[in-house]
């Protein structure tokens, strides 16, 4: 089963992305602060994208859907926090 990481995953676009991939049979992980209810069927990685402290370094994802980035610095910093991954969207 392919593993996908979705940043956010509780509101707006990221919620629907997480739901879509759960329904498509992916193993879906969401990264968020756990301040809102989670989509049924996802696995929560609780954290703030701006202060991850290496929690993703030992994980592999086939796809990373970074929905919550606002600028290039957000993207660069997040990619540097990731372990290995296949595709980054």
Residue ranges and their predicted role:
Residues 27-33:
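Conserved glycine-rich Rossmann-like NAD(P)H-binding loop of the short-chain dehydrogenase/reductase
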Residues 3, 27, 86-87:
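Residues at the starts of beta-strands that form the adenosine-phosphate
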Residues 2-3, 33, 49:
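Basic side chains
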Residues 7, 31, 68:
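Active-site-adjacent beta-strand anchor residues
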Residues 2-24:
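N-terminal Rossmann NAD(P)H-binding glycine-rich loop of SDR-like oxidoreductase domains
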Residues 36-38, 43-87:
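NAD(P)H-binding glycine-rich loop region in Rossmannoid oxidoreductase-like domains
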